[in-house]
């Protein structure tokens, strides 16, 4: 069996995730391998509202938004990998483990979110992921997180 590597532009991402500005934290997903792994991209800009208060004069992307960007990348991976596009897909955090922040992420950075599925199966509701966020090849953050997949039905048109 061959696995086709896919990608997702912002239009497809918005057909999968319910998040919108200012909380849509994935600009594109450049690699999706089924529902087992993916690589997302976040172009970090000064226009993001969290930089007004985190921190004035020294803008640093909050760690929680880095972890959320990894989780959103995992959500896109599940949407494409499990063919649940244009649905009422919601994914809820259940826990975050072994989270470490290693490098600041600042405006102008291009952050890559690498996620892989550790547990979960096609049609399942509980998944565990490992995520690593990098900037210029340096690890910025890493975490393991579990999520509950809630597919409540088709979106109305």
From Swiss-Prot:
The gene is fabZ. One of its GO terms (molecular function) is (3R)-hydroxyacyl-[acyl-carrier-protein] dehydratase activity. Keywords: Cytoplasm, Lipid A biosynthesis, Lipid biosynthesis, Lipid metabolism, Lyase. It comes from Ruegeria pomeroyi (strain ATCC 700808 / DSM 15171 / DSS-3). The keyword Nucleus does not apply. The active site is at residue 54. This is 3-hydroxyacyl-[acyl-carrier-protein] dehydratase FabZ. It catalyses: a (3R)-hydroxyacyl-[ACP] = a (2E)-enoyl-[ACP] + H2O. Involved in unsaturated fatty acids biosynthesis. Catalyzes the dehydration of short chain beta-hydroxyacyl-ACPs and long chain saturated and unsaturated beta-hydroxyacyl-ACPs. Its EC number is 4.2.1.59. It is an enzyme of class 4 (lyase). Pfam families: FabA.
